[in-house]
From Swiss-Prot:
GO terms for molecular function: endo-1,3(4)-beta-glucanase activity; glucan endo-1,3-beta-D-glucosidase activity. Interacts with scd2. Interacts with lsb1. It comes from Schizosaccharomyces pombe (strain 972 / ATCC 24843). GO terms for cellular component: ascus epiplasm; cell cortex; cell surface; cytoplasm; fungal-type cell wall; mating projection actin fusion focus. Disruption phenotype: Severely decreases occurrence of ascospore release from ascus during sporulation. Decreases sporulation-specific endo-1,3-beta-glucanase activity. Abnormal endocytosis. Following cell division, decreases levels of bipolar cell growth in the population. Leads to monopolar localization of myo52 and bgs4 to the old cell tip. Leads to abnormal localization of scd2, scd1, and activated cdc42 to cell tips. Decreases interaction between actin-organizing protein arc5 and endocytosis protein end4. Stubby cells with abnormal actin cytoskeleton organization. It catalyses: Hydrolysis of (1->3)-beta-D-glucosidic linkages in (1->3)-beta-D-glucans. Optimum pH is 6. This is Ascus wall glucan endo-1,3-beta-D-glucosidase. Residues 1-232 are annotated as: beta-sandwich subdomain.
């Protein structure tokens, strides 16, 4: 089954008025597609436009200052990482890759007084950059910036190539190469790079000279392709870089298309590389560790052995092929609305458990969800309606109590009507600039509602609302009428539109199919790139998406969510959830058990709101739902608990107490259940996005019934 069928391709729900964004992108001259807001190249059109963009393994930075002009290429080896704040501590809090190390800067003599950067074709995996002189003239350098690109490729038209380096050049050597020109460039840091040149005209020549230790020059205007790549150091290279790079030099990837199929518990997806130049050759593209774990045998055969370090995701290896085929098995088809055991045991509810759950539900159902969710934040209101939806779900599907269910469902529908009719404190609008659904809260204050107006955290926010709507649809199918369906579908299209044929929204705004997880940062400039603070709210969105598919009998949506959850599981357990045996992350941080805030250029065992250990851990647990154990395995939960949480669990008492214990139920549901059932588990230990009803039902349903 093709799972990338559009949700809908028609106009957006008229309940959302149209409005331009207060901060339009810079330098986007034209675009055939809705502008991506949460992708790796965002720094090219935001703020100063001079912060890096990480395509992995390379990063590129536009320079237009007093010293350098053009597009700088950087690559940082593992040995250059900076650990801190005390590099000798075990574990360290963070590490980052140093900035401003511009190995080679693609430029032109005509850029001596400045250059312009224009952008177009903003797509899921790529964007096209064009450099031109600030003075009159028609010369350009067109550079497709593509995730995983093996070369940084620039097509020159009528410009005189110049190359600079902030690290400084040591030597250059011309090497015989039959298809064009090749130079071996050594920098003063000992690193070696290759530069290839392919003139369009066979009569043209390309002669590169070392003008100074900071500049390589040519003497004539040039039209044709120039490609630059780094020779790996011996610690990661077990092949012959000359041979491998030579075989693919002259062809370059301009964009990547995605396709995906699901059959039962197996999902497959493909990256197909559109190419230019010598298109008869196989392009060279670098794969991340989680890609290599999932490659089919038809792709594994093209591994070259050429490796370069990524910034935060381990060593990447180059594959010379026009298509990647990836397979994910054991999709979470068994996961639905109700808890299931992840560590053995039965999900049968004992009379004792049912009595405790009923007592909690009888109290929680009286919660005033209508007024409590009348807030200025889509995120916080979403947590509250989702929490109450869980109470209603338990009343109906676990307790079978129609009185409690009807009482709760009536109030939940009333609370959700405020959002489906868009009459909350800060209504949503359709942004005609970036083509998305945003809160009006940030038009006067960009960081209002956690930056929702500027595309921060949409999958976090919408996930809670979609979950609540899915529960209503399950308990009362008559609620699934046009206006309510269109509300949910608009949120889905905004965050996870699966197809470029839906031209009203960017394709997969939050989820990054290349790195395998979402990015929460929207259109804010950042020296370390986009980031994600809460992995659990990432998969909560996909879980809610699946549940909505279930109540709508939408098998495409269900299967797409299942596949994305499997990809996310692979990615999170490769890069973010760590144990002492993890090999991808450096040993200096493994003792944190979770990377913390994951940026494109660093990881920081921290949160944006607290330095407390329980927050650093808990932000990757909230909310605990039936899907949690699929991504956070019982083994991982046990090791993390023993090392990081058990030493602190009795040293504090607040809403994070319940969050940590609910996560522990994945491994030890009986102890978690007994904790929740005890008289000492008071209301102050329950988060506003959870309830005692849900905690008891979750732990019992995971196998913890007494």
């Amino acid at each position: 089954m093709d799972v990338l069928v559009p949700i809908y391709t028609g106009p957006i729900n008229p309940v959302f008025p149209s409005r331009a964004h207060p901060s339009p992108p810079l330098g986007l001259t034209s675009n055939l597609f809705p502008i991506q807001t949460n992708k790796f190249y965002g720094n090219l059109y935001i703020g100063t436009r001079h912060n890096p963009s990480w395509s992995h393994p390379y990063s590129v930075t536009w320079l237009n200052g007093s010293s350098y002009y053009g597009l700088a290429i950087s690559h940082i080896d593992d040995s250059q990482r900076v650990f801190g704040p005390d590099p000798e501590s075990v574990p360290c809090q963070y590490y980052f890759n140093p900035a401003g190390l511009y190995s080679i800067i693609i430029s032109a003599r005509e850029f001596a007084s400045g250059n312009l950067l224009s952008l177009d074709q903003s797509r899921h995996f790529s964007i096209q950059a064009t450099l031109s002189a600030t003075t009159s003239g028609s010369g350009t350098i067109i550079l497709p910036i593509v995730a995983g690109m093996g070369f940084v490729s620039g097509y020159y038209t009528n410009l005189t190539p110049v190359f600079n380096s902030s690290i400084l050049f040591s030597s250059i050597t011309k090497i015989n190469f039959s298809r064009g020109y090749k130079y071996r460039i050594q920098l003063t840091d000992g690193k070696i790079w290759f530069l290839y040149a392919f003139p369009t005209s066979s009569s043209s020549t390309f002669n590169l000279t070392l003008a100074s230790n900071s500049q390589l020059t040519t003497s004539t205007k040039f039209t044709g392709l120039i490609q630059i790549c780094k020779v790996p150091n011996e610690s990661v290279n077990n092949s012959y870089p000359d041979t491998i790079y030579d075989a693919s030099a002259g062809v370059y990837t301009t964009s990547i298309s995605l396709s995906a199929q699901v059959s039962g518990t197996t999902g497959e997806y493909w990256f197909r590389f559109a190419t230019a130049g010598y298109t008869n050759l196989n392009p060279l593209m670098f794969a991340l560790p989680h890609h290599m774990q999932s490659f089919g045998s038809d792709t594994q055969a093209y591994k070259t052995g050429l490796g370069l370090a990524s910034t935060t995701m381990g060593i990447m290896f180059a594959y010379a092929t026009k298509t990647w085929h990836l397979i994910e098995k054991n999709l979470p088809t068994q996961v639905g609305f109700l808890p299931i055991p992840w560590n053995g045991g039965s999900n049968t509810y004992s009379p004792t458990a049912l009595a405790a759950i009923r007592a909690a539900c009888a109290t929680d159902i009286n919660f005033d969800v209508v007024n409590a969710s009348n807030l200025d934040s889509m995120y916080t209101s979403g947590k509250i309606v989702a929490m109450y939806a869980q109470v209603c779900l338990v009343a109906s599907r676990i307790l079978g109590d129609s009185t409690l269910t009807n009482t709760g469902l009536t109030k939940l529908k009333q609370a959700m009507a405020r959002f489906t009719t868009n009459t909350q404190m800060y209504p949503l609008v359709y942004d005609t600039t970036y083509k998305g659904i945003i809160s009006t809260a940030g038009y006067s204050s960009p960081l209002a509602d956690y930056g929702n107006t500027y595309y921060n955290d949409h999958h976090f926010h919408w996930g809670y609302h979609i979950y609540a709507c899915a529960v209503i649809g399950l308990l009362d199918p008559s609620w699934l009428v046009n206006d309510n369906i269109r509300y949910v579908n608009a949120l889905l299209r905004d965050s996870a539109n699966p197809s470029e044929s839906d031209t009203y929204f960017a394709m997969f705004r939050n989820f990054d199919w290349f790195v395998g997880h979402s990015w929460a940062t929207g259109i804010f400039e950042s020296g370390d790139g986009k980031d994600e603070e809460s992995t659990s709210e990432d998969f909560n969105f996909l879980y809610a998406t699946k549940l909505w598919g279930m109540v709508r009998n939408d098998t495409v949506l269900i299967n797409r969510a299942n596949l994305m959850l499997a990809v996310l599981k692979n990615s999170l357990n490769t890069y973010i959830y760590m144990t002492p045996t993890t090999s991808v992350q450096p040993s200096q941080i493994l003792g944190n058990y979770v990377t913390g805030i994951t940026f494109m250029n660093k990881v920081d065992y921290a949160t944006y709101f607290s330095a407390e250990e329980y927050c650093k851990q808990g932000i990757h647990m909230i909310p605990t739902t039936p899907i949690s154990g699929y991504l956070r395995s019982p083994s991982y939960v046990q090791q993390d608990w023993n090392a990081k949480i058990a030493p602190i669990i009795n040293t504090f008492s607040n809403n994070w107490t319940g969050i940590l214990w609910s996560n522990y139920a994945i491994y030890d549901p009986k102890t978690a259940y007994n904790t929740f059932a005890a008289s000492t588990f008071t209301a102050d230990k329950i988060d506003n996005g959870a309830s005692k009803t849900w905690y008891l039902a979750m732990a019992a349903g995971m196998g913890g019934s007494p």
